[in-house]
């Protein structure tokens, strides 16, 4: 192959890679909005409004990794994420005196999900990751709205065989008004009747789990005790699924 032909080949290959990157980013943006949104602003009847006033405002505890986001650092890419997939944002933190860059992918519809549920619940972030990482991710997801102010990190977890567990009573002593959304059953093994299971997410741009939860969460806030509903949930996800912590 002549030098001219090689130059043409490299130019075309570069243009193709740019086009492919743009297509993936555009497709992800499209997938986020192709599903009909949940109509959360429909006026409630006087009876419904009265019912809501008679129960306590609930607390929704949110996990981060593989629940709301997926991240990888400095070229370490899971097989489930296609090489070249653009991240939604990056964060730079110092871990053990070493600077580390994380590329973070947001689960589809996470921003809309947080906007809606923050009107219904007090939101609390509880991650088994280190504070320097988890706090930076929470800041990005909050987008300056002040809806993710309360945060708990690895130092607030209990290390047991099989991983970290999260003590919900440390967030609020009244367990009747608190629920946790987490992809790891081990994290809430001591509070199974307060748990809302969700499949782990890594890269699927067509995922709608967060959207699908909105009608359920809308109804759950009217209960006097969330455990009366969540204890009936038989959809227990395998406890052996892989969880990564930073």
Curated annotation (Swiss-Prot):
GO biological processes: nuclear envelope organization; positive regulation of triglyceride biosynthetic process
Phylogenetic placement of the source organism: Eukaryota, Metazoa, Ecdysozoa, Nematoda, Chromadorea
CDD domains: HAD_FCP1-like
EC class: hydrolase
NCBIfam families: HIF-SF_euk (TIGR02251)
Membrane topology: Single-pass membrane protein
Underlying gene: cnep-1
Reaction(s) the record says it catalyses: O-phospho-L-seryl-[protein] + H2O = L-seryl-[protein] + phosphate; O-phospho-L-threonyl-[protein] + H2O = L-threonyl-[protein] + phosphate
PANTHER family linked: DULLARD PROTEIN PHOSPHATASE
Entries under SUPFAM superfamilies matching the protein: HAD-like
Superkingdom in the source lineage: Eukaryota
Name of protein: CTD nuclear envelope phosphatase 1 homolog
Subcellular location: Membrane
């Amino acid at each position: 192959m002549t030098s001219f032909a090689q130059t043409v080949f490299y130019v075309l290959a570069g243009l193709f890679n740019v086009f492919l990157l743009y297509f993936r980013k555009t497709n992800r943006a499209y997938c986020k909005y192709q599903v009909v949104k949940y109509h959360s602003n429909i006026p409630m009847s006087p009876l419904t409004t009265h019912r809501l006033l008679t129960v306590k405002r609930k607390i929704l505890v949110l996990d981060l990794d593989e629940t709301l986001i997926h991240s990888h650092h400095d070229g370490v890419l899971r097989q489930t994420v296609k090489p070249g997939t653009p991240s939604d944002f990056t964060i730079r933190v110092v871990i053990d005196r070493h600077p580390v860059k994380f590329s973070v992918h947001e689960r589809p519809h996470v921003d809309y999900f947080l906007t809606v549920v923050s009107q219904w619940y007090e939101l609390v972030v509880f991650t088994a990751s280190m504070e320097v990482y988890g706090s930076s991710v929470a800041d990005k997801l909050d987008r300056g709205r002040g809806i993710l102010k309360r945060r708990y990190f690895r130092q607030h977890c209990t290390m047991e065989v099989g991983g970290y567990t999260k003590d919900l009573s440390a967030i609020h002593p009244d367990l009747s008004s608190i629920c946790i959304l987490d992809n790891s059953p081990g994290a809430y093994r001591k509070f199974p009747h307060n748990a809302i299971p969700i499949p782990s997410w890594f890269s699927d741009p067509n995922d709608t789990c967060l959207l699908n939860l909105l009608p359920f969460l809308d109804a759950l806030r009217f209960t006097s005790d969330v455990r009366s509903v969540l204890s009936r949930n038989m959809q227990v996800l395998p406890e052996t699924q892989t969880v990564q912590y930073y």
